[in-house]
Amino acid sequence: LVPIVSSGRAAKLICEKWKSIYNYLPDALVVEGPKAGGHLGFKNEQIDDEHYQLETILPEVIQEAHEIEEKYGRKIPVIAAGGIYSGDDIRKIMELGADGVQMGTRFVTTEECDASDVFKQTYLNAHEEDIQIIRSPVGMPGRAIFSNFIQKIKEGKKQPKVCPFNCIKTCDISK
């Protein structure tokens, strides 16, 4: 099991909670920065804040993983994700101490990806200005490609469907 975290604090909380409840530690940790696609584990104001960028939070998560390793005698690899695009990006992240990288968006348009051809073509046709931060159905910021559907949501003409599985929930206690 490999949870996605966005801070050293989150990594520590998950590891300690899993250990106390299940007597199990994560097999690895994915630390995802705010440049990722899809749902983001950050508030809107944190997305461009240098204190929350992958290069800043990665060392914090690595430090927590090392402390867990010392405490329990088990290495937890740290995998970096979010905004990693090129070989140079991979090199920089690995030099910061990551055990590996996770790249998702980079491979969406490949033959091996099972997304629909229409979805893939949307990626291929997109320009930088088409990428927007939206409020997802669970209340979290998300990075998405602008579309007519997104425009209708912004205008209040459409509402995203609620996920019946409740697999992602907002941490906003006011809701």
Which residues are covered by each model-predicted region?
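Short catalytic-loop micro-motif centered on adjacent basic/acidic residues
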Residues: 2-3, 78-80
